[in-house]
Amino acid sequence: MIIVGDIGNTETKICLVNSKNIIIKRVILLTKKINHSSLNKSLLGLNLKNKSINKCLFCSVVPKKFNAVKIFFKKVYKIKCHELKKLNLNKLIKIKVNYKQIGSDRLANAISIINNKDNFIILDFGTATTFDVLIKNTYHGGVIAPGVKLSLDTLTDKASQIPKINLKKTNRVIGLNTISAVRAGFFWGYEGLIDNIVNLIKKETKMSFKIIITGGFSGLFKNSIKTKVTLNKDITIKGLIRATTLIK
């Protein structure tokens, strides 16, 4: 069995994967709360002490928290954890930019779906909204825009008369009150941002792409984006599973 994990700015996912590369158990915890105690409590259900773990691989955009995870697994379970960007990724994917400046999760996403025939744009609704461009088997860079939830939380925190709201689809553009106006602004604003950036990428590269979407708000925008898209919620984890072949 193997362990793979995605340490994001907001959430951390840790998955137990069997020999057929199927996720059999997963835990999710808040990244900011990661410490020895929270990891010990969260991972009890995985029953790791009674399992043979061959490999452990994480992608992390929060180095301090990965270090805490690494120390925990080594101390409690005698398991050595690797970080994705420390592996020789050139065996799986060609990277045209300075990979040290690419989020580890974005590289995992790319590794998950890359092949020698298709071009992809991966749209990830995380703390930031990111677009990653893959042409054949090469990562060509991407776009980073403000995240939906981060932007919404910032607005409601800074504007005293705008209440906390749950973002959901709306058919109206013109809001009839504060809440519906904010919902319209975010829903149609991000829908326009997404379509525009995808079209600009196509124009700049003069190529066609398959669009993969993932992350927290992917379900909300799946049917409103004008371009045909495929939803892949576990793309990051699947990329990590694929990358474990690099661990000897």
UniProtKB/Swiss-Prot annotation:
It catalyses: (R)-pantothenate + ATP = (R)-4'-phosphopantothenate + ADP + H(+). InterPro entries: ATPase_NBD, Type_III_PanK. It is found in: Cytoplasm. Its EC number is 2.7.1.33. Substrate binds at G103, S104, D105, R106, T178. The keyword Zinc does not apply. A monovalent cation. Ammonium or potassium. This is Type III pantothenate kinase.
